[in-house]
Regions:
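Aromatic/acidic polysaccharide-binding cleft in carbohydrate-active enzymes
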Residues: 119-223, 227-230
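Active-site proximal loops enriched in glycine and acidic residues that flank catalytic Cys/His/Asp
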Residues: 35, 66, 98, 126, ...
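Conserved, mostly hydrophobic/aromatic
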Residues: 1, 31, 94, 157, ...
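Composition- and surface-driven signal marking solvent-exposed, interaction-prone regions
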Residues: 108, 135-137, 172, 179-180, ...
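Short helix/loop capping segments that flank catalytic or ligand/cofactor-binding pockets
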Residues: 41-42, 133, 167-168, 244-245
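Carbohydrate-binding surface patches
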Residues: 217-257
Length: 273
């Protein structure tokens, strides 16, 4: 499959690719070795597969798997298993999967600040927060704030599930970004949350806090500066059932500034909207 996707023009599989109407190589960048695999057998096999692939395709980035469950304390760094790999230096990107509750997700708002640097890049390949809508969606955003605040981990994030058919929504814990039918599809609130994070990125993280936060542990905030657009971006998530008046504390502003607000308003009980 790799040779078919990016091999040179002299090989059999590239000839097949051209024959199928795609003479140019596909933009393959990453290969994940395994899926939710871990333990001594996997650590050994990862090294063998890594050596075979990286020798032939040195420009690709290889992703390793982590333990599925959270071991020990809820905020344990799953990457503590990296030293158990045959050659830890060959673990360039580490895939972490999380399935947990709304309460757990809110507790992880500062999770990645505590990660050891200089190890492997961070990849959240699967994230599923179960619980009552829309709090599960908002709690997902609280974790995403922690991911984007820690850009020095070179984080990657994969949205899932991307799409699900109307007929298979019943009893599903994790809702998709898109719901499709025979001739149409609908964007869900999960899609719009992802879009808001995508459309409002920053490359410089700044300190921000909410004044008088005592008793308001369901409010989450993060802030940064986008050097490309020269804009300051402040993000707020409110998991409460009511509107609240907040006074953000942001250092560095000497005078009032104009601001543009983008809101995602969610209605309890309307999961598929």
């Amino acid at each position: 499959a790799v040779e078919y996707a990016i091999g040179d023009t002299t090989t059999k599989w590239v000839a097949e690719r051209a024959k199928n109407g795609h003479p140019a190589p596909f933009p393959l960048k990453y290969i994940e070795i395994g899926n939710e695999d871990f333990g001594p057998v996997y650590w050994e096999r990862y090294e063998k597969i890594y050596q075979a692939l990286s020798t032939k395709y040195p420009d690709l980035i290889y992703i390793a798997n982590s333990v599925i469950r959270v071991v020990g304390r809820e905020n344990d760094d799953k990457r503590k298993d990296i030293p158990n790999f045959v050659n830890p230096k060959n673990v360039k990107v580490f895939d972490e999967h999380y399935y947990n509750s709304i309460e757990w997700a809110c507790e992880q708002h500062y999770r990645f600040e505590n990660y050891k640097r200089g190890v492997a890049d961070l990849f959240i390949g699967e994230l599923g927060i179960s619980g009552k809508y829309p709090y599960n969606l908002l709690a997902t955003g609280a974790i995403r704030m922690s991911i984007e605040r820690n850009g020095d981990l070179n984080p990657l994030f994969a949205e899932r599930p991307v799409m699900r058919h109307w007929d298979f929504l019943e009893h599903r814990i994790f809702l998709p970004m898109l719901i499709n039918g025979v001739d149409s599809s609908v964007k869900t609130s999960f899609f719009y949350l992802a879009k808001m994070f995508r459309d409002h990125t920053f490359d410089v993280c700044l300190d921000a806090a909410i004044k008088d936060m005592e008793g308001m542990q369901n409010i989450f905030v993060t802030m940064g500066y986008d050097t490309g657009s020269k804009q300051y971006i402040l993000k707020l998530i409110n998991l409460q059932d009511k509107k609240v008046t907040l006074q953000p504390e942001v250092s560095g502003f000497k005078r009032p500034v104009k601001a543009h607000k983008t809101s995602l308003v969610l209605v309890p009980g309307k999961e598929n909207t």
